[in-house]
Amino acid sequence: MLVLKKAASSPFRGQGVTVLGMSAGVGKTAVSIGILRSLSRRGVDCAPFKAVAVVTPDEYAGRSLPPWRRGVVQSCTAAGTVPRWWHNPVLVNLPDARTPVGDLYVRGRRLGRVPVTGADRLDLGSLPDRLRRRCQDAVEEGYRRLAGEVPWLLVEGAAGAGDLPPAADLANRILPELAGLPVIVVASARQADPADVSRLTDRLTPALRALLLGFVLNRVSDHPAADAAAQRLARASRLPVLARITDAPPPLGYDGSPEKIDLMCEYRASCVDESGLMRLLDALPAARPGLVEATR
């Protein structure tokens, strides 16, 4: 059985952050890529960890890769590392964006077909007990392995935090609580509804709420409107808006191809650097995330 072991008795003294999203499509992967590439530029040994990913064939950047490597190909490129199963232990490969059933890969191996609920969401409660346990064990083992290898980890959630019941949400609740890293929540300036913020904070477990640093307002194009959105978010959540990332067109020459991923990573890093978010992350003290240890 796998149990949580507090990091006080572990040699790992890493830093890192967990990036969650208000909902699917707010740009948390773009923010994550920017953070990782900004760190990599400075020679920081960093890596992404995504407990669960859902991918489709129309995602051009990973089309030439085995399905189980597609979920973190851009984030791993940003960090200067090669995708391994422990960067993304659980992945569902859908045949297309309209079909809610796909192939489940755990530790890089196909284990059958499973349903998903909405964009990028795998509900543990919908799986048979055997598959549910295998998924959770793989996520805990993958995180433990990566935490022992890399001193700076970025844990990325999936879809929207609070969309699934806590006990069924590997990506946004179970793993982030195990990691124990500071949490930032990405919100889109185009859809920052205070009611959604209130629902989000109500749905998060007390342990996860205690880790929250604040919000990153993404896709900012109208600065007066962003000021108003930031004030609404702060009032609804009683948390600060840590940074605002400007909405800008993709870099010249980017066509979504695998060969141009590096160009996009540089672009994302520049956007994150300009927002001031990296100064805040640099100021965080060394974290002591919980580590998963195997016991009999």
Give residue spans per PLM region.
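Flexible phosphate-sensing "switch/lid" loops adjacent to ATP/NTP-binding sites
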Residues: L2-R296
